[in-house]
Amino acid sequence: MPYHRGGDASSQADKLSGIVEESDLYEGFAPHVETSEIKTLDFYNLPKQTGKEPALRSYTEIQQLLQQGKKRDVKNILRENSWPINSPIRAQLWPMLCGQHQTKQQMLDGFYWEMVHQVFGTTELSEKPIMLPAFVDATHCLPYHLTSTGRAVADRIVNVLGYDCPDITYSPVLYPITSILLHFMSEEEAYICLAGLVGSKEKVFINQTKLQHEVTWKTVMQIAKKHTKSATSYFQRICPGLKLERIFMDWCWWILAGLPFQHLVRIMDCYFHEGIKVLYRVALVILNLFHKECQSNNEWSPDNIKNDIGNALIKFCKKIPVSPAKLLHAAFSIRGLSTQYISRIFIKTEMLLKSRSVLTSGSKQLIKSRSSDNLPTSQSQVNIQMMSHTLTIREHFGLPGTKNFIKTWTDRQFLFTLWSWLPVRITMYQPVLLYTTEEHGCSLTTFYVRVEQHEPTLLMIKTCNNEVFGAYCSSRWFERNVKDDKGQRQAYFGTGETFLFSLYPERAKYPWVGIEGDKDLGHSSELFMAADSKMITIGGGEGQAIWMDENIRFGKTDSCKTFNNPPLCPSGDFEIRVLEVYGFVGI
């Protein structure tokens, strides 16, 4: 560690003493933390102690209060005690705080490692990256200051938690919180902490479904409109066409991806006791601070931020002009933000979203899909994996707990991703393979015989170049024969629930462009499905998204107005190696 020359001998001695004791600076961190990165954050720029500050409370004191049921006293201590970022107290404090929310019986010693062995077949940490569950947001797997080993540990924890808690279907914040926990404790302790947070019934800590996630950010938006009215009005004034939704969808990343680590750690001290309402309060303070800076700092002038306020907010958080203590003080000084008030808005927002599950566009009624709310049941996973040729799963099939599980994981990611895109009601049914070119031949006639009466159907294409893509088709293929009042067959049929997807090499879903209820769409944006004796096509309007010939051998893919998709394979033209079509039993 560099130090300054000059000064008196005692000053130099103090500095040298600091060098000798440098290792003590890191005693609060777990072994899988890159401490050299953290050194530059806070240690040598701490505010000088005036001697008037009360002594920081100890773990034992807090433990006694918690055992006595004095949660309010604990809350006040956590809010007011600014333990340094490297304080060893968190290694004991955080597990205790998270553990109080555990509703299940206390985990037996070794339970986590038994789960690891059941899922991976070994407790050794793999040197190769492992595929994360579908509920993880791959763009926000924030490691903070974890080493590569620490990141692998975080990956493993999240996988085991996903296996143990199959009800978790969408939880983008779970990975970052896992990473934060691992800075101060062991792998097993971090897992137990997460299990406590996820299993909490009294307070909400981590959203676990797409619906909860959406209700939460909309709740934050509603609260902000009241408690940070000046800020939200300012954003709309400088960007007249701006929808506030675009800003608040990323509200949690202002905190988890934007704030400096020392701020984040102090927020977690309170969050692990009080729940997600702490993050609500911090988000409101960030908005107010940003608004003030916009009016006084040229860096955040309207011209500089109006094109991307969301990104500007993240950048502002990285340079936030207040200390962790001041940030928390401001957050907990907001009046009228009780738990009851927040719950009232949350429930109202949730009911509103559920009531809008049926969208109306013109004369058509569509079921809006909360696509990530459900993943496959264990049996439906077995069924589709054992049947599928396109995903090349059958020859590697294995269940969790067998040695083959790791081999199937690369292919199972496709299954989980695809299943998460289906309308929620469809995921309740078991898939059945209706048609595959490998068993039923390459004939459009056979395709119709086996498929046309089923609704909906899922088409998956694997090309000779190994691209994998397809479509969810909401209507029966038999509708190609339905005639209008004039006795003419309709060229296109289907509904806006139809969507395209690509699984390899790109992974993406392309829903109907009108799914958000835009009433100004033209006819060319409502061309979902078409078929005759010579071809089938999905998606039209200035191009066909998927077109296949009568021999189901050759096809082409273009951009189209109905789905606003790019070509689903780079060349545009493709030769079909396998076509599979699935229906769903019991619909």
UniProtKB/Swiss-Prot annotation:
Effect of substituting R281C: Reduced binding to liposomes under low phosphatidylinositol 4,5-bisphosphate (PIP2) concentrations. Reduced binding to inositol 1,4,5-trisphosphate (IP3)
Keyword terms, alphabetized: Cytoplasmic vesicle, Endosome, Lipid-binding, Membrane, Phosphoprotein, Synapse
Gene Ontology terms: cellular component: cytoplasm; endosome membrane; neuromuscular junction; postsynapse; synapse; synaptic vesicle membrane; terminal bouton
Binding site for a 1,2-diacyl-sn-glycero-3-phospho-(1D-myo-inositol): K75, R79, K277, R281, R335, G336, L337, S338, T339
PROSITE patterns (alphabetical): TBC_RABGAP, TLDC
Domain TLDc: 408-585
Subcellular location per the Swiss-Prot or TrEMBL entry: Cytoplasmic vesicle, Secretory vesicle, Synaptic vesicle membrane; Endosome membrane
SMART domains recorded: TBC, TLDc
Gene Ontology terms: biological process: chemical synaptic transmission; negative regulation of neurotransmitter secretion; negative regulation of synaptic vesicle recycling; neuromuscular synaptic transmission; neuron projection development; synaptic vesicle endosomal processing; synaptic vesicle recycling via endosome; vesicle-mediated transport in synapse
Keyword check for Membrane: yes
Protein name: GTPase-activating protein skywalker
Organism: Drosophila melanogaster (Fruit fly)
Lineage: Eukaryota, Metazoa, Ecdysozoa, Arthropoda, Hexapoda
Gene name of the record: sky
